[in-house]
Amino acid sequence: MGKYFGTDGVRGEANVELTPEMAFKLGRFGGYVLSQHELETPKVYVGRDTRISGQMLASSLISGLLSVGIEVYDLGVIATPGVAYLVKKDGASAGVMISASHNPALDNGIKFFGGDGYKLEDEKELEIEALIDAKEDTLPRPSAQGLGMLHDYIEGVRKYQAFLKTTAEGDFEGYNVVLDTANGASYTSARAVFADLKANLTVIGENPDGLNINVKVGSTHPEAMAKKVVETGSDLGLAFDGDADRLIAVDENGEIVDGDKIMFIVGKYLLEQGKLAQDTLVTTVMSNLGFHLALEEAGINSVITAVGDRYVVEEMKKNNYNFGGEQSGHMIFLDYNTTGDGQLSAIQLLKVMRETGKTLSELASEVTIYPQKLVNVRVKDNAAKKSAMDVPAIQKVISEMETSMNGKGRILVRPSGTEPLLRVMAEAPTHEQVEHVVDTIVEVVEAEIGVK
């Protein structure tokens, strides 16, 4: 990670850390870096979620892009994976998404995609950062004839929706589905897509006001959806996050089916169909021990990466795997798209239910999840979270807790890639053991580097 770019682009509190001035610089310098080798006039696609700051930041970002002669195509409100898909499909030079994903409305972010539809390599991000920090802006300043133009490209949203529907390879007639669009980027598209696929829908979290994105709805708050599934007697619930690159499901009994279980269900189906590349699923260190035991039982190999869907994608590209993801609900189907896609994942999950004739609870029952607890400890600043593992007291308590587990469980303490948080996670055979381990570590972390 660089000075401005984290694991998922540039993020911060809108109009405080991520200002219009910074958005302009990211547009100007990012656009320049990404279009240096274009033979024709470069074109860049821009999308955003429903945050109130999105229009402000989009205006500044687009101005920066136009100032270096780039043709900008404004997609308006669209899911992050929609931007990635359209950039690659249409042969655009790059794409930019304005979103802070599952974060609250006060935050926002700017994320770049290259012309291949993948998130930017670290080298390109560092190149952009160097231009931002340069003492003088020496980039070309074209006169009227060399400036870029802005085009509305709402048709792009419809193209993305049409693509999603093709991946269903049929319809979902007869299925009763609760959708939770998190008052976010999928608030119109998800209803349109699943209605066209003939599912009977109940939709929550589809009334964004600029401030309510991810508030008590969406993949990070599936409780309201779970309640609605039980109330309506639906077959399942499907919750996306603010930019719709994640999916968390709920079965017909209102039980949460997280990314690990969804990956197992879809991965096993792909294996049985001979469509799981190298019989391998790529996941991160956050995936549950029970998930890995289920994979082993099913004959599926696993490759483990650092936390972050970008690292999952890097591993998949490097070794030609086609399916991977995270417990948090990012799932990447490289046969279809270049990044995590919540709506695509939902369609694939429903497809498995349709083809097997099984309920979601039946499919999910093959994975026995070990008790897990995750606590996010807010620390003083980003420097504190990065140096946390060098603090002797924190090292000592982790070592003591690992010894107490006697090899029957695991502990993972890591910094958030996007916020000043230290994530403390443990898994063990019993809830009591997990509670004790996590609470003990959290107490020390808060005492040493927590916000007082």
Curated annotation (Swiss-Prot):
Coiled coil (residue ranges): none
GO molecular function, one term: magnesium ion binding
Residues modified as Phosphoserine: S101
Biological processes annotated in GO: carbohydrate metabolic process; peptidoglycan biosynthetic process; UDP-N-acetylglucosamine biosynthetic process
CDD domains found in the cross-reference section: GlmM (cd05802)
Cofactor(s) needed by this chain: Mg(2+)
InterPro entries: A-D-PHexomutase_a/b/a-I (IPR005844), A-D-PHexomutase_a/b/a-I/II/III (IPR016055), A-D-PHexomutase_a/b/a-II (IPR005845), A-D-PHexomutase_a/b/a-III (IPR005846), A-D-PHexomutase_C (IPR005843), A-D-PHexomutase_C_sf (IPR036900), A-D-PHexomutase_CS (IPR016066), Alpha-D-phosphohexomutase_SF (IPR005841)
Residues the entry annotates as binding Mg(2+): S101, D241, D243, D245
One Pfam family it belongs to: PGM_PMM_III
Cellular compartments per GO CC: cytosol
Presence of keyword Transmembrane helix: no
Reactions catalysed: alpha-D-glucosamine 1-phosphate = D-glucosamine 6-phosphate
Note on cofactor: Binds 1 Mg(2+) ion per subunit.
Role description: Catalyzes the conversion of glucosamine-6-phosphate to glucosamine-1-phosphate.
Protein family: Belongs to the phosphohexose mutase family.
Name of the protein described by the UniProt record: Phosphoglucosamine mutase
Gene: glmM
